[in-house]
From Swiss-Prot:
PROSITE patterns: RECA_2 (PS50162). Keywords: DNA damage, DNA recombination, DNA repair, DNA-binding, Meiosis, Nucleus. Interacts with brc-2 and rad-51. GO terms for cellular component: DNA recombinase mediator complex; microtubule organizing center; Rad51B-Rad51C-Rad51D-XRCC2 complex; replication fork. Has a role in the homologous recombination repair (HRR) of genomic DNA during meiosis. Required for rad-51 recruitment onto ssDNA gaps generated at stalled replication fork barriers. GO terms for biological process: DNA recombinase assembly; DNA strand invasion; double-strand break repair via homologous recombination; reciprocal meiotic recombination; resolution of meiotic recombination intermediates; telomere maintenance. This is RAD51-like protein 1. It comes from Caenorhabditis elegans. It is found in: Nucleus. GO terms for molecular function: ATP binding; ATP-dependent activity, acting on DNA; ATP-dependent DNA damage sensor activity; ATPase binding; single-stranded DNA binding.
Amino acid sequence: MDPSENVFKYETAYDLLVRLGAERLFLRTCLSILDPVLELHPGKCYEIDGDLGVGKTQICYSFAAKFLQTKKTAKMGWIGATPLRTDHLLLHIEHFGNQTNEDILDRIVCKRVEKIAELQDSLTRFLDTINLQLVIVENIDAILHDTVYHKEMGRSMQSDVVERIRKLTKLEITVILTNHITHWRGYPAPALGAFWSSQINNRFFIEKRNDDSDIRIVSAMKGEQDDGMNRIEFKIGDRGLKAVE
């Protein structure tokens, strides 16, 4: 054998676990058929994009429910302009039945924010939260809406928020954002402008099959790894996500 053909590639223990698909390493929803697309790695930031009412928050509830049931002692943070609907979240976890509702809710740190400064402060405070492994920011477009119209100042504010998110991911905390889609360019694009979009490497898109359908389609665009734009259909039922029959 030609020695030149022996190529050794450096691989960390984390890289090995990712390659082997270690079950507890990934964050998934409660609906296993979505795993090929919605499979999140720790220490990364993901954005879920879609029109209003398409089911972005329901996806987040499902991620949160699975996380809280599989990570028995871990905490998560929830940031949003409106209060977390714990009644909706509990619908997603009822079929597990492994923990009481009080156990679940005690491990959620909620922050209601309406201003950019409040978002910045909340992200920074999460850095000091013990055993925090997941942060969800609902409707970040509503919180950062004004940054789109302030050009350089707005970009500076967006950069500051991105940097605070990166500090969280460096601690192996997974961050999930939801953002709505705009159509003013003539095609669907994430809100908050081109600069914000350029800062998010891992992105999911949720849409309805058509205007009259209750079937949703989720697809993934993860940085350089396109994987042919995997697309999976699902529905949103009374107790969470469900497969299309």
